[in-house]
UniProtKB/Swiss-Prot annotation:
Entry EC no(s): 5.2.1.8
Catalysis: reaction(s): [protein]-peptidylproline (omega=180) = [protein]-peptidylproline (omega=0)
Organism, as annotated: Spinacia oleracea (Spinach)
Lineage: Eukaryota, Viridiplantae, Streptophyta, Embryophyta, Tracheophyta
UniProt keyword Disulfide bond, yes or no: no
Name this polypeptide is given: Peptidyl-prolyl cis-trans isomerase, chloroplastic
Length: 449
């Protein structure tokens, strides 16, 4: 990552609890928990506060300090790009072109940071009529930023726009439903229409508190209708990856975490939507590990101001060892670009010269879920995963270094705020699939029994 942030590098071991990317007195100082790894790229190691290394840990220390430093350095650059006027910018070396083109070109509008909205827009559909219903319902969130009952006037305008769009476009929406899902889709549209009437009554009763829950219910109907427009899996995965576990669709998992030493939080259950439409290899790999109970009993291994990370198994292995081969199972870097029908494999968007390309699954939402990898090996992802802990104002879409460099494959959609309460040593009691397992192709957990 040295080509992106021009730091001073020292031949020290990056196995530290804290790295100093720029200025330790800055409010955006990056803290990096220890990953028990040692970098083999000694000449490119950022200056760190190091600790004494256990000889038994040396083998595992080789590569994942590179991962933790790479991700944190990328996040540092993301902060710089997202907030170009930060007071500590004078302490940083200039970012090299063309990694960050003109921000005025990159930032075309406020980023979408709601994970469920991101998932709706990421579906492989092209139906303008349903989007015209979706958008004003989503705009209710912005309307509710107005204080007091005045917000309800804007909410009512949003609702009327959505109702009008549904009335005028209903036939086009129904025509866009997959034939096998048409009956269910029509039923959902009826519920959506009835729910809009209920929201209208809430507004007329001046019940501000009742708006947001009903809005979310309506948007869930919209999302379900849009999912019913997808007819099968929309493309062929490249031949070299077709025998891997693939998620051809979406799945939902629930992750239960035991939080230690926190009087306010004991157990957290996170609902995570895995998006196999845009990351079939990455999401399939993760779901296959979930079905193997790979993550059950594993601790949170990293938690700083930017990410929560886990997935490093005990022992010398740095990822999942496939029992059938007794070798590490790794997967390629997988990025779906906006406007493309098949993901890019094995290369970052920067390496391909796609500096202005937008990703279908951006690092916008608090709780964005992605695959960790070694900095200099794009196809080294295995089992280590991380969740983003930053608001999208600091990492706006298409203006942060993480987009196109790490494979996003899902979002936390329930209780994501509690990710900020997790810390190193908290235990993942279980990760269980609640839907979508039937979309998993080539599962190895069945072979393992």
């Amino acid at each position: 990552m040295s080509s992106f942030i021009n730091h001073h590098f020292y031949p020290s071991v990056c196995t530290s609890k804290h790295a100093l990317p720029i200025n330790p007195t800055s409010p955006f100082y990056l803290g990096i928990p220890n990953f028990r790894q040692k970098s083999r790229f000694m000449h490119l190691t950022p200056r760190c506060f190091s600790r004494q290394i256990d000889p038994l840990d040396k083998q595992k220390k080789r590569s994942f300090s590179v991962k933790e430093c790479a991700i944190s350095l990328a996040l540092a650059a993301a902060l710089i790009s997202g907030v170009p006027s930060l007071s500590w910018e004078r302490h940083a070396e200039a970012l090299t072109s063309p990694v960050l083109p003109d921000l005025a070109v990159l930032i075309s509008g406020p980023p979408i940071k709601d994970p469920e909205a991101l998932l709706r827009y990421a579906l492989p559909i092209d139906n303008k009529a349903i989007r015209e219903v979706q958008k004003p319902l989503e705009d209710i969130t912005e309307s509710l930023r107005v204080l007091g009952l005045k917000a309800l006037d804007s909410v009512e305008r949003n609702l009327k726009q959505a109702s009008r769009a549904l009335k005028n476009g209903k036939s086009l929406i129904i025509a866009g439903l997959a034939e096998s899902k048409k009956d269910r889709g029509v039923e959902l549209l009826d519920k959506l229409e009835a729910g809009m009437g209920e929201l209208q009554q809430i507004v007329e009763n001046r019940n501000r508190e009742g708006v947001a829950p009903k809005q979310r219910e309506l948007l869930q109907y919209v999302g379900s209708v849009e999912e019913d427009m997808v007819d099968g899996f929309p493309y062929e995965v490249p031949e070299e990856y077709q025998t891997m576990p693939l998620l051809k669709g979406r799945a939902v998992v629930e992750m239960k975490v035991k939080v230690k030493d926190n009087p306010n939080v004991d157990n957290c259950v996170f609902r995570i939507v895995l998006d196999g439409y845009n990351a079939p290899v990455t999401a399939g790999n993760f779901l296959d590990l979930v079905e193997r109970h790979f993550y059950d009993g594993m601790e949170i291994q990293r938690r700083d101001g930017f990410v929560v990370q886990t997935g490093d198994p005990e022992g010398p292995a740095e990822g999942f060892i496939d029992p059938s081969t007794e070798k590490p199972r790794t997967i390629p870097l997988e990025i779906m670009v906006e406007g493309e029908k098949v993901p890019v494999y094995g290369s970052t968007l920067e390496e391909l010269g796609l500096y202005k390309a937008q990703t279908k699954l951006p690092f916008n939402a608090f709780g964005t879920m992605a695959m960790a990898r070694e900095e200099f090996e794009n196809n080294s992802g295995s089992s280590q995963i991380f969740w983003l802990l930053k608001e999208s104002e600091l990492t706006p879409s298409n203006a942060n270094i993480l987009d196109g460099r790490y494979a996003v494959f899902g979002y936390v959609t329930d209780n994501q705020d509690y990710l900020a309460d997790l810390k190193v040593g908290d235990v993942i009691e279980s990760v269980q699939a609640v839907s979508g397992v039937d979309n998993l192709v080539n599962p190895t957990y069945k072979i393992a029994g």
